[in-house]
Amino acid sequence: MHRVCFDIRLKNFGHGFWWVAYLDDVAVAFAGLHASVQWERTGYLARAGVHPAARVHGLQRRLIRVRIAKARRLGWQWLVTDTVENPTSSNNLIECGFRAFEPAKPWATKAAAYWRLKL
C-alpha cells in the first residue's frame, strides 16, 4: 500500500497503531499513530496514504479522526504531524482541527509544514 501511495522508501514503522481501509477486500488507504519521541503525552500521526483510485471520498479525513479518537483514549494531550508539499493533506488536517506551528526542534525536511492539535 505504501508503494502505491508514495514514491519513497518506507521507514521501519513496526511500532504504534495502524489502520487499513478496504474496499471490496482490497486495501485502499492506511494510516499510523505512535507516541512522540520528543514530547510526553503526545502522539505523532505517522505515514498515511490513500490509493489514487480511492481519493476524493474523505478517507484521509476519516483516518485522521480515527487516530484523534485513539489518542484521546490513550490520554494523550497533543497530536503532532508534518506534511511536505501536500496541500490536500494540509487542508484535511486543518478541517480536523490541526493548526500550523513551528517546533523548537524540527524533525522533518526543510520543506515540511508542522501541525498540532490540542486534545
Model-derived features: where do they sit?
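Acetyl-CoA-dependent GNAT
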Residues: M1-R41, A46, H51
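Short hydrophobic/aromatic beta-strand or adjacent loop that forms the aromatic wall/cage
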Residues: G16, K110-Y114
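A short linear hydrophobic-aromatic micro-motif
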Residues: G32, V80, F101-E102
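Residues that line or immediately flank small-molecule/substrate-binding pockets and catalytic motifs
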Residues: A35, P52, T83, K105
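Conserved acetyl-CoA-binding loop-helix of GNAT-fold acetyltransferases
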Residues: V50, V56-A69, E95
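Conserved GNAT acetyl-CoA-binding A-motif
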Residues: A71-V84
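Conserved active-site alpha-helix within GNAT-family acetyltransferase domains
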Residues: V84-P103, W107-K110
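Short beta-strand-to-coil "C-cap" segments at the C-terminal boundary of structured domains/repeats
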Residues: R116-L119
